[in-house]
Amino acid sequence: MLSPGAVLFFTLLLTASSLGQRTRKPIGSTSPISTIQAQVNFSAQKFAGTWLLVAVGSSCRFLQEQGHRAEATTLHAAPQGAAMAVSTFRKLDGICWQVRQLFENTGVPGRFLFQVSRARGPVHMVVAETDYQSFAILYLEQGRKLSVKLYVRSLPVNDSVLDVFERRVREANLTEDQILFFPKYGFCETADQLHILNEVPR
């Protein structure tokens, strides 16, 4: 049985690679996320605040096998200089957990790196499309595989936003069968000190 930390790690990261294996980088190849354009004139100040995770497109085997364990997930973002301090909240066995991360500045607005203790190397993240007020589409890459996430400020989700997300998923060479939709109820926003995972580099 997976430990609570392991379950949180996989469900929060939701990348499409096997994190326990080292992926060889083909000579002369480019990183998949390098072809993804960040939101034009991205503003961390406008992006700050609360986001609700709606769906993830990924070929991750863990998602296919453990998707039934998905829980409502909330993300809080706050600018920290050129970086962003991020806290993710979700329940596990009825208890609210918090994962703290720092999305580090890469020098390109809308592009970030963050560290995860169980991953081999940094995770790349791009805010590809957002209107700041209603939705945001994020790409993550670890192990040279992409996952696509849809966040919203509030529910329900506009059909036009879902159309944009599904198009982005297809463009990432993923199928609709590889989309996991998260619960729309049961969100939590606070965790006690015993249920906080701190992934911020020290």
UniProtKB/Swiss-Prot annotation:
GO MF terms held by the record: retinol binding
InterPro entries reported in the protein's UniProt record: A1-microglobln, C8G, Calycin, Lipocalin_CS, Lipocln_cytosolic_FA-bd_dom
Glycoprotein as UniProt keyword: yes
Known regulation of activity: Membrane attack complex (MAC) assembly is inhibited by CD59, thereby protecting self-cells from damage during complement activation. MAC assembly is also inhibited by clusterin (CLU) chaperones that inhibit polymerization of C9.
Key words, A-Z: Complement alternate pathway, Complement pathway, Cytolysis, Disulfide bond, Glycoprotein, Immunity, Innate immunity, Membrane, Membrane attack complex, Pyrrolidone carboxylic acid, Retinol-binding, Secreted, Signal, Target cell membrane, Target membrane
Modified-residue entries (Pyrrolidone carboxylic acid), positions: 21
Glycosylation sites per record: 41, 158, 173
GO biological process, alphabetically ordered: complement activation, alternative pathway; complement activation, classical pathway; killing of cells of another organism; positive regulation of immune response
N-terminal signal peptide: 1-20
Disulfide-linked positions: 96-188
Pfam families, per the entry: Lipocalin (PF00061)
Gene3D superfamilies the record matches: 2.40.128.20
GO cellular component, one term: membrane attack complex
Cellular compartments annotated: Secreted; Target cell membrane
Known role: Component of the membrane attack complex (MAC), a multiprotein complex activated by the complement cascade, which inserts into a target cell membrane and forms a pore, leading to target cell membrane rupture and cell lysis. The MAC is initiated by proteolytic cleavage of C5 into complement C5b in response to the classical, alternative, lectin and GZMK complement pathways. The complement pathways consist in a cascade of proteins that leads to phagocytosis and breakdown of pathogens and signaling that strengthens the adaptive immune system.
Similarity section: Belongs to the calycin superfamily. Lipocalin family.
Subunit architecture: Heterotrimer of 3 chains: alpha (C8A), beta (C8B) and gamma (C8G); the alpha and gamma chains are disulfide bonded. Component of the membrane attack complex (MAC), composed of complement C5b, C6, C7, C8A, C8B, C8G and multiple copies of the pore-forming subunit C9.
Name by which UniProt lists this protein: Complement component C8 gamma chain
Gene: C8g
